[in-house]
Regions:
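Repeat-blade elements of multi-bladed beta-propeller folds
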Residues: 50-54, 89-110, 137-164, 188-208, ...
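Short, conserved, GDST-rich strand-edge loop motifs in beta-rich repeat architectures
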Residues: 202-213, 261-262, 288-305, 442-471, ...
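Beta-propeller blade signature
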Residues: 213-224, 304-318, 372, 475-483, ...
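N-terminal cofactor/phosphate-binding cores enriched in small/glycine residues
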Residues: 63-181, 505
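Extracytoplasmic beta-rich repeat domains
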Residues: 82-93, 126-149, 177-192, 230-276, ...
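Repeat-solenoid scaffold signature
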Residues: 188-224, 331-390, 403-415, 419-424, ...
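Blade/loop signatures of beta-propeller domains
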Residues: 33-78, 240-250, 399-403, 467-468, ...
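Bacterial N-terminal signal peptides
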Residues: 12-26
Length: 607
């Protein structure tokens, strides 16, 4: 990595050199930097349960369970399976609380409870919320659901038609149901909620429908809305006040959520909060991303389009913003900003720092000081030509003018695509290795801006997209990233995008799934394939591991292809339409040849 005038720069050639190093190094143990750990308050000692999709507030997706090791993982066998009854994209993480597993399906968002204390884990109960069927027609990218959360004897989850529901974890009886989304304007909810200090944190989807983004805090007791913070509009509605202290000048000024847009465009400007939220109890701050501005055609929204494609730090009690950083000002390519942020404490350039690490959709692994929002490092983790780096003095992404899109102009070979070098699929961090394990894409695209008018409840995109395989011809990869060194330790190439999440354990094993349907275990140190199992459908879910009632370690994954990347299968799209699924259909034509729709839970254990 070269540093020039305060900028972090690593182009396609520099990335190729890094890749060459990592592929060679993949067979050799890389020395881990010491003392990189999540804050103890955000990642308490592992009790063997899995009560939230990210495992803990620090979003490490790391388990201290170690019965399954590099040496014995090859003997893993199926303990039980369960059909969800829904053959759509299964993106959720199962939860395990005590002797019960909880699963939320894609639409119609059925919540199941399985009895882990009985042979075969039979169903304890199921809750059917009966969401509005019309929600399916306004969902951007399949009818997915990313999971539930447990707190104080209740399961909390969202439905596609905009409801947040609390259910008694023991009985399956509903406790409350709050309607917070409006499908008539194209608003849906697909994210997993996060429970913080007696509040249910929820955000909306709908950026491709011109829906204004927000995050809400609901009272966990009765479901009433405590506060709402919008991603666009006046400071008062974004909950920006005197405590707001962004690090960079580009994020300072009054009512930037209005003035950085054409008149009234912020009202339909997106910035939806449909991804991951982390929480630092010591700082008492939540961290959440904001989605892309709408429409995709940048000619229709000149300006930085605050506060989209960025990250907020907020007070969970009031929602008041403390700082903000914009990953991609005036987002040209739907790079969004909702990925997971892993909270870590480490030494950076000789100083102890409270950081968050974020593998972002625009192609960079960012290291931010989570107390201020200062960018400490920003390095590509794959092929990037849409930008030339990040200016560490100003914090601003350096756009490559050759890849700027506009109305009526076809721009070819933009890397990464609108789906990003990595989309929502969450990474995992191991304090044993100091490595972040990143499931991601390797895709490029052609884009053409087109005119579009806003009509409530209909697509508001304004862009023709055709995706193609990235450099090397493989369409996905699984990368182990050395956080301290800001470079890859090893890289595994995959034929299709790796659209599943990852989990890493104290047994030094990393689990992830492929869109062909392989569930894989690899060495956390070297990336060596240790075990794989072919499931009945492509995998886009989030693996977990837990201690069962018998005291043994189990690993679970939902299999069922779909989501944006797998829409050609789950939506049975015509592969002759190169722009179907916002361009994804073109690069995934052959997915139909290797997998079919499904919806099955697989759980594994040692003999």
């Amino acid at each position: 990595m070269a540093r020039i005038d305060g900028r972090t720069k690593l182009g396609m050639i520099g990335w190729t050199l890094l890749v060459g190093f990592a592929l060679v190094a993949g067979a050799v143990a890389q020395p881990a930097e010491p003392a990189i750990r999540p804050p103890a308050a955000a990642a308490p000692l592992d009790d063997g349960q899995w009560t939230m999709p990210a495992k803990n507030y620090a979003s490490t997706r790391y388990s201290e369970l170690a019965e399954i090791t590099e040496d014995n993982v090859k003997t893993l066998q199926v303990a039980f399976t369960f059909s969800t009854g829904v053959n759509k994209g299964q993106e959720a993480a199962p939860l395990v609380v005590g002797d019960t597993m909880y699963i939320v399906t894609p639409f119609p968002n059925i919540l199941y409870a399985l009895d882990l204390a009985r042979p075969g884990a039979p169903m304890k109960w199921k809750f059917e919320p009966n969401p509005e069927p019309a929600a399916q027609g306004v969902a951007c990218c399949d009818v997915v659901n990313r999971g539930a959360a447990f707190s104080n004897g209740r399961i909390y989850f969202n439905t596609l038609d905009g409801h947040t529901i609390a259910v008694d974890a023991a009985t399956g009886k509903p406790v409350w149901n709050t309607h917070i989304g409006n499908i008539n304007i194209g608003e849906t909810i697909t994210m997993a909620p996060l429970m913080v200090k007696g509040k249910v944190l929820v955000g909306n989807s709908g950026g491709e429908m011109g829906v204004r983004g927000w995050i809400k805090a609901l009272d966990a007791g009765d479901g009433h809305v405590i506060w709402t913070a919008y991603s666009t509009g006046p400071d008062a509605e974004v909950l920006i006040g005197p405590d707001f202290k962004p690090h960079y000048d580009m994020d300072k000024g009054k009512d930037l959520g209005v003035t950085s847009w054409p008149p009234d465009a912020w009202k339909i400007g997106g910035g939806n909060v449909w991804g991951w939220i982390s929480y630092d109890p010591d700082l008492d701050l939540i961290f959440h991303g904001t989605g892309n501005p709408g429409p995709w055609n940048p000619d229709l929204r000149p300006g930085d389009n605050k506060w989209t494609s960025g990250i907020f730090a907020r007070d969970p009690d009031t929602g008041n913003a403390k700082w903000f950083y914009q990953w991609t000002p005036h987002d040209l390519h739907d790079y969004d900003g909702i990925n997971e942020q892993v909270l870590l404490d480490m030494t950076w350039q000789g100083k102890p720092r409270k950081v968050l690490v974020r593998p972002e959709r625009n192609g960079y692994v960012y290291l931010l000081d989570r107390t201020t929002g200062e960018v400490l490092s920003a390095v590509p983790f794959g092929p990037v030509n849409s930008s030339k780096g990040v200016d560490l003095k100003t914090g601003r992404l350096i756009v490559n003018p050759e890849k700027e899109t506009s109305t009526g102009k076809v721009v070819r070979n933009i890397c990464p695509t609108a789906s990003g070098l990595k989309d929502w699929q969450p990474s995992a961090f191991s304090p044993k290795t100091g490595l972040l394990y990143i499931p991601h894409n390797n895709l490029c695209m052609d884009e053409e801006g087109v005119e579009v008018n806003y009509i409530a409840g209909t697509p508001y995109v304004g862009m023709n997209v055709r995706m193609i395989a990235g450099p090397g011809g493989h369409r996905g990869a699984f990368t182990a990233w050395n956080v301290a060194a800001a470079k890859p330790a090893w890289i595994l190439k995959e034929n299709f995008p790796v659209w599943s999440g990852a989990v890493v354990t104290a047994g030094n094993v990393v689990f992830y799934g492929t869109m062909e349907g392989w569930f894989k275990a690899v060495s956390a140190t070297t990336g060596k394939l240790l075990w794989q199992f072919k499931t009945s459908s492509g995998i886009i879910g989030q693996p977990i591991t837990y201690r069962g009632p018998d005291g043994h370690q189990y690993v679970a994954i939902l299999s069922g292809v779909g989501g944006w990347a797998g829409a050609i299968v789950s939506g049975d799209l015509d592969p002759r339409d190169a722009t179907a699924a916002l361009g994804f259909a073109n690069v995934m034509k052959d997915l139909k040849d290797v997998t079919t729709p499904g919806g099955t839970l697989y759980v594994f254990r040692l003999p």
